Curated annotation (Swiss-Prot):
Pathway: Amino-acid biosynthesis; L-tryptophan biosynthesis; L-tryptophan from chorismate: step 5/5. It is an enzyme of class 4 (lyase). InterPro entries: Trp_synth_b_CS, Trp_synth_beta, Trp_synth_beta/beta-like, TrpB-like_PALP, TrpB-like_PALP_sf. It comes from the Bacteria. It catalyses: (1S,2R)-1-C-(indol-3-yl)glycerol 3-phosphate + L-serine = D-glyceraldehyde 3-phosphate + L-tryptophan + H2O. The beta subunit is responsible for the synthesis of L-tryptophan from indole and L-serine. Signal peptide: none annotated. This is Tryptophan synthase beta chain. Its cofactor is pyridoxal 5'-phosphate. The gene is trpB. One of its GO terms (cellular component) is cytoplasm. Belongs to the TrpB family. The modification N6-(pyridoxal phosphate)lysine is found at residue 91. Tetramer of two alpha and two beta chains.
Amino acid sequence: MTYNQPNNNGFYGNFGGQFIPETLMTAVIELDEAYREAKADPSFHEELDALLKDYVGRETPLYFAKRLTDYIGGAKIYLKREDLNHTGAHKINNALGQVLLAKRMGKNKIIAETGAGQHGVATATAAALFDMECTIYMGEEDVKRQALNVFRMELLGAKVHSVTDGSRVLKDAVNAALRAWVTNIEDTHYVMGSALGPAPFPEIVRDFQSVIGREAKRQFATVSNGQLPDAVLACIGGGSNAIGLFYPFVNDESVAMYGAEASGLGLDTDKHAATFAKGRPGVLHGALMDVLQDEHGQIMEAFSISAGLDYPGVGPEHCYFNEIGRATYDSITDEEALESFKLLSRLEGIIPALESSHAIALTQKVAKELGADKSIIVCLSGRGDKDVAQVKERLKQEAKEGK
């Protein structure tokens, strides 16, 4: 059966949709119509492809991680090097696509939310390129954790708005950005950073990020005499790098799909972001998806060492994949992610983002299970420059405590 989601109402099975106030409906309908037109227009794709090639530096390599493979002693591990993109992560794929769409719609102002700051930097970069005014909403906690990325955004000409509501992290930044969009829909486009939000956002983000999986599929075929990998794997917060890798393989039933979510200090604590392990369906930021909530339906605070993964929900298409068993989602602790951060740095000379380190940690388990005659493609979603200072402090603290 050929996969054909979302349906015309923006649902992936029971997940997704448009759970938004009437005031936002006009903007969302306008966006949907503009996106359908752009999607059918070859000149839009030509302009985006040229930017991805000449400005972003695509295609990114598919790198056989021999030393990591030998160390684990299981499946051959290929890293899809999204860390080598301009701005250092996969986020630029989507930001450029959406800012190009905004230009086509005649919008001259851009707003976005950001957690780790990577989507904020990517959006500020695209806005600078197209000479658009840019405001980035970022939780106060994340502003502290990611001071370097805040400076980068400001250097690129963006205004960074520190959000002091709620738990002052990513979900609060999304709330603030949506509120700002409602009052400025005539001249402003909201660049959603992950495969979340009301339809058509999850589909738009998926389509712009699918360049990851399309390239990886083609590259793997080149090194394997036209074969498919046995598995593809990525970390998952909202889920955009994962959906970008997964989607081009969704009809290839022989290819297993694995997502690594963040279990923070452990599933037996309340300090985690393991939505599939501990969440249940609810509405958040305009879509029905699995979310972390208490017994009264209040959204709970997510926690992870990685600012890009501490979101209390997960994109509706991943929820659908989980429900129908097309993908398998497992959780990785802060400790496991830190070990993998160090491991990849030492074995391959590649310092991964803490988000991507969760994927590397799950890869160690999956590669062993698959065995030596199999192959796995792992999305290395971003580089670790932004995390080095945080990890240094963490390791210093652990040394002091004698861990």
